[in-house]
Amino acid sequence: MATTPDAAFETLMNGVTSWDLPKEPIPSELLLTGESAFPVMVNDKGQVLIAASSYGQGRLVVVSHESYLLHDGLVPFLLNVVKWLCPCPGAPIAVHSSLASLVNILGDSGINALVQPEPGEALGVYCIDAYNDALTEKLIQFLKNGGGLLIGGQALNWAAHHGHDKVLSIFPGNQVTSVAGVYFTDISANRDWFKVSKEIPNLRLYVQCEDELEDDQQQLLKGMSEIYIEAGVIPSQLLVHGQRAFPLGVDNSLNCFLAAARYGRGRVVLGGNESLILNQTMLPFVLNALHWLMGNQTGRIGLASDMKVLKSMLPNSSFQWSESELLTSDLSVFCCCSLANIDSEEVEEFVAEGGGLLIGAEAWSWGRRNPYSSCMTQYPDNIVLKRFGLGITSHVAQRGSFPFPNPEGTNYHFRRALSQFESVIYSRGSSLHESWLNKLSQDCFYMFQMTHQRISIYDSVKKHALKMIQSKDFPSVTEQYPIARGSSQAFLLSLAYELFKSGVDRSQLLPPPALLPPTESPITIKISTDNDNSWVSTGLYLPEGQVAQVLLPSEATHAKLKVLIGCHRDNISQARTYFRPPVMTYVYHLTSSQTSISWLYGGLLYIMVPNKYNQDNVSVTIRGAVSAPYFRLGKTTQEEWKNLITHSKAPWGELATDNIILTIPTVNLKELQDPYPLLQLWDKMVRAVAKLAARPFPFQRAERVVLDKQISFGFLHSGYPIMGLISIVEGIISEFKIRSHGIWGVIHELGHNHQKSGWTFPPHTTEALCNLWTIYVHETVLNIPREQAHPSLNPELRRQRIKYHLNKGAPLSNWIMWTALETYLQLQEGFGWEPFIQVFADYRTLSGLPQNNEDKMNLWVKKFSEAVHKNLAPFFEAWGWPVKYAVAKSLASLPEWQENPMKRYTAEGTEGRE
């Protein structure tokens, strides 16, 4: 028996070389929404005319016109269908009287079939048209128990008499086939051209058929004008991806936090947090939701323990309640905050056969606990919710007040939006709004998580996305050819990235590569516990489009080692204009003895070593990459360096000491004939940084500085690595320029890296304290006095800042940046650098440090006063610090600071704080 969609398709199409259809009948396009459903016959417009699926233990084939089942030209295919549907050899084949002549067609081919008014108790195959509404329950149970059902029909005539928007929900055939995720629609299908596919054909992204979803939306939101998500409630964003799923509540960025769906004969309402349901302000919505979920049913509403408060919240309702953790047969609706403890097949069948499901849950906390897991396929609730066309994501929605309904937000739907973008790509439609494109990018991230299981409704999305990339070629973005955020090109970049992450081979995304540099002999890097929590440079570069192999011992496959391709870590997606791709790095987890690695943009290679790494002397071998310029102080010889910069084709290289590593464009490195004096100077500067911070030296993890064409903000920012624009390259690789002009920016960022929360008072000192390191390095290493190191430290400007601050009454709101720095400069000029080193060292030994600024500032007053053996309370009070009475009293026994520089300003008549 064929057990996978691919095997089933092969069985159904065995020996079928052409589609011979009658010309007169007008078929209905079929809509596929179920995970088990797949197309069998698709026309040149992408419309499905024949589909197959399964439900419970049984199988189903749906044909878009009943006359096709009586057409001699389809006999070879019909024989395959009966064979595939038959649960076991010799099982009975029965035909409803509406298709009586099918008995003769099958008989002529040696298959015995009988006309029967309904399926018999013995499981076999039953053939029927799609217009019978008396056998619905029997057909569903026959299918569920293991029978094979062949059904054909079209809904066009029915729609003309009963309403186009009712077809999906009420058309008799859909009452049966919908449980397996297949629908007859009110759309006529093109009959002109059919191609026999060798593999499962692709589905359209979105079928523009009429539905009741707009009416459903209105019914669910009746009486609601807005929703207020209060502080403390953090809802997850929801992915609304099924054709019959729709958003209800969205924030200002189109992030959905409340949604609903029809699935089979049942309905689902989903909130991105249980508080969106278990909240008094949401009672009107909850009442609407429960009535909508009940539909025409009369059973009880089941309440899981985490939802039983609903009963007391709705004391005057006419509902019959039942507290239950299980989906019992007497329930019409089930309410819960988690589906983790209920079998997913049970939940799917409950909804498919008419049940209603109300659930409120978030996944952002799960995402934080499982950062490398697939939210859509591994988060327990999503295992079943994704079948309903919904998903709970690990991203959070905004909080605040949002209108109900929001036309722009509730009109956005993932499949519809991607389909519209596809029309733009093929010049068949107008461009999408930037907000839709931004939302689409994020939704693709989650949608592509579901495309590893060969499920047509998911795989088809990936295939369409890949075809868009291939039709327009891979987007190139450079300084000469920038791309605007929100443009079609920007979305294609994002789409390519998400496709690559989902497993699409880079050869399907990138154009054929130019002649690649020859690969080097395998390089082996030793990883030890000394590399704990760091990136280990390999001195190798992986060109774009090239594949390398990473090998490591089997005992190291659980060590959580990773390979990082590229070091330009800033995600610049929020920039208005891109001068390079928004995401330039990619990480592979080394969980097997051999890992193939590649990346759309190539990059320098690093081994990422986790925190608390405990395996020593592990050999990691890389083959298939090329050497990059890499000079390590004390190891690389002058001759080796000259050879590297002469012959390397890698665009980036590195200059390294044990304490700092600089990533520089190769074109700039070629001008550096001897990096030794430069790196000696850098080592002296970072030694000074460590000394002031009272940190051990050499560093356990070297600081990193990476230059880039474009970074996330500013021209430099702190972090690991420190990121800076290429325009500053001369200022960091020229020993002469550093010694003569200083290097304020990078040392400023190093200062940020060494600031500690306990003695930083945001926002006042965030950009002030870090400058202590710049001044210290300039004065103690470069012999550049502070007034020359930065123009803002001109003595007269400093005096003016102090006077201005005091004339305003020394408000704390004014004590920021250069004004805040002045306080520390006065302390340094009065007592030298040693007290700072001592106090920073003391802070490293303290536990239970205060978290608010006032308490942190008072601790600093106390600590610094004790370090210099002076009562500094009056000094800090003059600056406007909120010195507490108890702290001032505890310091009163210390000698007065006679040289307090603030006295000079008060003596001049400036009003200071008492």
UniProtKB/Swiss-Prot annotation:
Summary of the tissues where the protein is detected: Prostate-specific. Present in both dorso-lateral and anterior prostate.
SUPFAM superfamilies: Class I glutamine amidotransferase-like
InterPro entries, alphabetized: Class_I_gatase-like, M60-like_N, Pep_M60_3, Peptidase_M60_dom, TCAF
Residue stretches making up the Peptidase M60 domain: 533-832
Pfam families: M60-like_N, Peptidase_M60
UniProt function note: May play a role in the regulation of the cation channel TRPM8 activity.
Family: Belongs to the TCAF family.
Something else known: May act as an autoantigen in prostate autoimmunity.
Name of protein: TRPM8 channel-associated factor 3
Source organism per UniProt: Mus musculus (Mouse)
